[in-house]
């Protein structure tokens, strides 16, 4: 009663939309939400689940898996590779260097994070030969020594040093942090341009917090010499991409209207 909250209703609420549309702002930016479900992740999400034939001794048995089983009971290297390829090929780029914009990828487990980190580094080496040398992506989980320091370095744009794309440009060489839950809450990195949901999310609080990692405003700046002086190049961050591979947005809001839909080819998988 002291604070006038006996009704249970908040006396003040400041939403993402409020932050985007604030007349004194904007103070936040909206995501461009990408529906990137594969055939397999779509079936894992269905009520009937995803059924595959599994060899058990001399017999084949049908096993049915659901979203909660991904990277716990159901494993598919092809699906993980498809997630990585889709993310890399469609990620927002840094407006100054043209390299993949900084991002955070959320995985099911530490083992899953290790797999995805390796796949991202291999794919980045093909896209940008000799630019990263396995520093493109870094696993940031609680079992990694120095992980907390890595998150700070990523925030300060010196994780693995600075980008090799443009001398003097203050941006991390490491572009993607791969985590499970460490960077979900209380982490503020303003120049994030890409968020990858490589796992299903069932907690609305976690979903809101993860989405919030990309909403901070930022201006990308770089100065070049021109006509005996300096010319400043400035690009305000107007949005970020949220890659939803497991229909998380639809899970929390039925018939969610995605901003972009990527049709992915069919792949095979085994349990």
Q: Where are the predicted features?
A:
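Long, largely alpha-helical accessory region at the distal end of helicase-like NTP-driven motors
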Residues: 65-72, 82-85, 246-271
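Interdomain helical connector at the RecA1-RecA2 junction of SF1/SF2 helicase-like NTPases
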Residues: 2-101
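Short glycine-/polar-rich loops that comprise or flank the Walker A/P-loop
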Residues: 7-12, 24-30, 100, 132-136, ...
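Short, conserved catalytic or adaptor-binding loops enriched in Gly and charged residues
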Residues: 4-6, 18-25, 127-133, 167-169, ...
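Conserved C-terminal RecA-like helicase domain
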Residues: 63-177
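Flexible phosphate/Mg2+-sensing switch loops adjacent to catalytic phosphate-binding sites
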Residues: 2-14, 125-135, 218-230
